[in-house]
């Protein structure tokens, strides 16, 4: 039997087989075409969590992990597992890049800022990694260490941030470490070039602009009462005592900044505006900083110190297609464009020979429940035109709707 000359990998991001009850949006939805495919053709399911995708046992998966493993065609051990091991076995305590940064702060009497997502979601970061960094900074004798916290509410309960902050504050009690600011990931971890969102985070971190509080946990509880959950938490600056006119600290020139998110996509923009990209029209200017990231966010970034370099993932599907002399196209809307390109190619930024990349802009709405179709129709039109014009041998296409709309928690929109 002659094998087909072309292949189409269509990824319904966030679509899965659930418990089949009232809370299962996909099961409750009307999906006649998908149902017909299941009825007519052989099919199977994939395990998307835990050790089967290179994560710690029981740890839920995510889009980055899924695309990386599919593109590699094998289990790729993830940064969460690697860093957990480094913390557990005190390898992080001996990390030369980290120690050099902390020693720089000590020798030059500079402040250390730990910035990143404070939760145990394990998708972008983990609170245990932050706790370890706090401990190491204390052990190394750093004069001042401050936490600039981003709240989650997306990869964990929408109102769990208050508990995480309380846990963190207990951990750093009686240590020369303090919580300086808090802001929701919606602003600090944008990845869609919504610079107006990023500016709120920048202004908090650099200019100290935000609501002034002395009790951050109470401030989060107040926010919940106003129906503003962790993801969308407005900027908060934390003061050590009532009546202070200035925040505890802001990021100053020549300070040491350690961004402890290990996933690469959602701290690129805040790193850009702090260190790489002067955006005068937005009122954001880069600062001369000793800047450290947990992993390498972007190979084009200059003067960034990296704690954990990624494993070199070779012989991915894209590379094999290139070696076979075939053509391929990767297509998604903005939200998932890095997943069908960078992640699917094993962390490779550049396109392979014979590879075309098509990005359809995501809609400019506050949350995707307001436009649950997102840019699916634009993707459809773009790929049909490309097939007609170029006849690619392989297509990798991502529809982001189920994942991105599902994250809003609005059941009717997801269904």
Which residues are covered by each model-predicted region?
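Active-site nucleophile/metal-coordination loop of metallo-enzymes that catalyze phosphate/sulfate
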Residues: 2-8, 15-186, 196, 200, ...
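Active-site regions of oxyanion-processing enzymes, predominantly non-cytosolic
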Residues: 4-7, 383-403
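Structural motif
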Residues: 9-11, 113-115, 258-259, 394-398
């Amino acid at each position: 039997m002659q094998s087909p000359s072309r292949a189409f990998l269509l990824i319904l991001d966030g679509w899965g087989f659930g418990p089949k009850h009232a809370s299962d949006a996909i099961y409750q939805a009307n999906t006649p075409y998908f149902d017909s495919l299941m009825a007519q053709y052989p099919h199977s399911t994939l395990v998307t969590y835990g050790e089967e995708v290179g994560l710690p046992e029981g740890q839920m998966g995510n889009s980055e992990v899924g695309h990386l493993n599919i593109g590699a065609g094998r289990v790729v051990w993830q940064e969460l597992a690697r860093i957990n091991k480094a913390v557990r076995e005190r390898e992080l305590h001996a990390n030369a890049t980290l120690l050099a940064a902390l020693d720089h702060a000590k020798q030059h009497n500079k402040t250390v800022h730990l910035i990143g997502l404070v939760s145990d979601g394990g998708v972008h970061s983990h609170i245990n990694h932050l706790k370890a960094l706090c401990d190491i900074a204390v052990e190394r004798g750093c004069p001042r260490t401050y936490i600039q916290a981003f709240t989650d509410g997306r990869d964990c309960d929408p109102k769990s941030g208050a508990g995480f902050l309380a846990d963190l504050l207990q951990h750093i009690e009686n240590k020369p470490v303090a919580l300086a600011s808090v802001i929701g990931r919606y602003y600090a971890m944008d990845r869609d070039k919504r610079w107006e969102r990023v500016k709120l985070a920048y202004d908090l971190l650099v200019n100290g602009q935000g609501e002034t509080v002395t009790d951050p946990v109470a401030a989060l509880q107040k926010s919940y009462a106003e129906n503003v959950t962790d993801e969308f938490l407005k900027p908060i600056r934390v003061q050590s005592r009532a009546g202070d006119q200035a925040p505890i600290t802001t990021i100053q020139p020549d300070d040491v900044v350690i961004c402890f998110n290990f996933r690469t996509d959602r701290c690129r923009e805040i790193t850009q505006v702090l260190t790489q990209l002067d955006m005068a029209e937005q009122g954001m200017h880069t600062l001369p900083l000793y800047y450290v990231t947990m992993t390498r966010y972007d190979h084009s970034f200059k003067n960034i110190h990296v704690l954990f370099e990624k494993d070199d993932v070779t012989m991915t599907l894209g590379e094999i297609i290139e070696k076979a002399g075939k053509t391929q196209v990767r297509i998604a809307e903005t939200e998932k464009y890095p997943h069908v390109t960078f992640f699917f190619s094993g962390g490779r930024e550049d396109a392979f020979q014979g590879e075309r990349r098509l990005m359809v802009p995501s809609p400019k709405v506050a949350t995707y429940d307001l436009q649950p179709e997102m840019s699916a129709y634009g993707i459809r039109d773009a790929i049909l035109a490309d097939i007609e014009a170029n006849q690619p041998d392989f297509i990798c296409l991502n529809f982001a709707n189920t994942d991105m709309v599902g994250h809003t928690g609005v059941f009717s929109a997801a269904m």
